UniProtKB/Swiss-Prot annotation:
NAD(+) hydrolase (NADase) that catalyzes cleavage of NAD(+) into ADP-D-ribose (ADPR) and nicotinamide. Residues 164-297 form the TIR domain. It comes from Paracoccus denitrificans (strain Pd 1222). InterPro entries: TIR_dom, Toll_tir_struct_dom_sf. Pfam families: TIR_2. It is an enzyme of class 3 (hydrolase). One of its GO terms (molecular function) is NAD+ nucleosidase activity. This is NAD(+) hydrolase PdTIR.
Amino acid sequence: MSANDRAIETLRREIAKLQTDGAAIARKDAGIRAKLASAMAAQAKAKTAPALRLKQAEASRLEKELMATSKSQADIATKIAKKQSSLSAKLVVQANEAKKADAKAKKNQERVSKTQEEATRKLEAGYRKLTLENQSLEQRLQRELSAMKPTAGPTTNADLTSAPPHDIFISHAWEDKADFVEALAHTLRAAGAEVWYDDFSLRPGDSLRRSIDKGLGSSRFGIVVLSTHFFKKEWPQKELDGLFQLESSGRSRILPIWHKVSKDEVASFSPTMADKLAFNTSTKSVDEIVADLMAIIRD
């Protein structure tokens, strides 16, 4: 509460008290006037000189009391008028302060609204930029996939149809074989999955590119073991490009496994892969991952 507001409350209390005091004096004044009228009437009826002098003295005393009450009423009226004037001035100040406070609150609200609108515009601009970047990335990926050509002769439809069907193709970097991929491949095969894995599927004299193309084309699912080693290799990335192309045509489905990498690292390599539901070797064992994969394969 401001000093002006406190002064207003004080003035209102003082005015109310003066009005109460004034009402009491007014009642006293009325009583004196009634007694004075009675004393005057008694003078007219007095039959002896002593009785007359007694009533005259009483009337004189009442007239003096009446003058005192009249003066008190006048003083109270003057005080009330002064305090009413002060109260009016304080109320004007209060109204001006309220007006200023409203203007300040409105200005603050406008500033907050402007800040929120600016933040919304920035978010929308960022979203549009991200959308354009994703579109550009997808277009570039399609161009690169279209530009890919076999280095060891074309892979024909006959090659693909003659290849035995596989449940899973494993794309990986060879550095990850020892600590994860080899155990994954053997556990999958032991669980009954048909696995295309280079150690299982390549024979001396086979064309590496043609064999991989056959494996890709004949597999229902493509496991991609994403690791720091994978990100640095050109050949696994070409396999991934081929899997993307097959997935876009509905012929295969990519199943990512994050091996000792974070989501930020995956997103830096491929935003599309970062958005896919993935298995993580940091949170699941080989047996647990294989159990989940077999559930997907058999679904």
